[in-house]
Amino acid sequence: MKPQLVNLLLLCCCCLGRHGVAGTWSWSHQREAAALRESLHRHRYLNSFPHENSTAFYGVNQFSYLFPEEFKALYLGSKYAWAPRYPAEGQRPIPNVSLPLRFDWRDKHVVNPVRNQEMCGGCWAFSVVSAIESARAIQGKSLDYLSVQQVIDCSFNNSGCLGGSPLCALRWLNETQLKLVADSQYPFKAVNGQCRHFPQSQAGVSVKDFSAYNFRGQEDEMARALLSFGPLVVIVDAMSWQDYLGGIIQHHCSSGEANHAVLITGFDRTGNTPYWMVRNSWGSSWGVEGYAHVKMGGNVCGIADSVAAVFV
């Protein structure tokens, strides 16, 4: 069967699956069909690279009904945050530990299941709060969901669901010593709200310190930071992640277009292509059960440019 016919059948099936067979298509349905058609063309290009070394593969997912500019506006809400090259004055030194072939903080039961930021550009808040949750659990305390909405509503110099900087959020949390409350007390709404204040006596988790690093060309040191300090907040270029289904991301992203904040929980160097295990905030149905695998070395997607470790 010709590829054009396959794409047409897929287009029809997907759209019928979303909108049913009754009635006529509205303008919004036609727009979604046009976006899906553009996605199919884009997938052909993204998958045109040789499929070797477990390279990533791309296809139809929950974002295929969005044009790239819509996807970027809705889901890529992180601002670039400059970090000094390691080592630099003021940075916490990294112990010179031996690197295992594979390590994942999930195996230590200190990483919560993947969350979903929905149509809120609050990735910067999700990554920071997830790092704090894990840092607390690494100390032997319970692994709880903390309030992302509290950071979205209250963080100074950030814009909530319209975007923000994870380093700016960490600096604000550290300087104010604000206590993050449980998600159940201040649940996620996926929209900006008015900041709710809690008494200082309120139980919660505060950020004692954080360190920001630029590990470009030093990803072994970055792996040591992960081992020594816990999951790391990073900012990446995730435009091509709109179409990601699995495999190891090695191409199709830039080290100069940071737009999305995520959390690195581990790495795997057992195969031909070593990779970072990257926890996203687009739900567990995206990627590899909510994770992306990004090649270690070469600063793929700018993953080593702005890296933060959190201490609670």
From Swiss-Prot:
Prodomain residues = 24-98
Where is the signal peptide, in residue numbers? 1-23
GO cellular component terms, semicolon-separated: lysosome
Residue positions with a glycan: N53, N96
GO terms classed as biological process = proteolysis
Q: Does the keyword Protease apply?
A: yes
Active site positions: C123, H260, N280
The reaction(s) catalysed by this protein are:
The recombinant human enzyme hydrolyzes synthetic endopeptidase substrates including Z-Phe-Arg-NHMec and Z-Arg-Arg-NHMec
The question of whether Transmembrane is a record keyword is answered with no
Q: Which InterPro entries match?
A: Papain-like_cys_pep_sf, Pept_cys_AS, Pept_his_AS, Peptidase_C1A, Peptidase_C1A_C, Peptidase_C1A_papain-like
Alphabetic keyword roster: Disulfide bond, Glycoprotein, Hydrolase, Lysosome, Protease, Signal, Thiol protease, Zymogen
Q: Which cysteines are joined by disulfide bonds?
A: C120-C161, C154-C195, C253-C301
> Pfam families in the record, alphabetically?
Peptidase_C1
- Its biological function? Proteolytic enzyme possibly involved in normal cellular protein degradation and turnover.
Which family does the entry's similarity section mention?
Belongs to the peptidase C1 family.
Its recorded name reads: Cathepsin O
Q: Which organism is it from?
A: Mus musculus (Mouse)
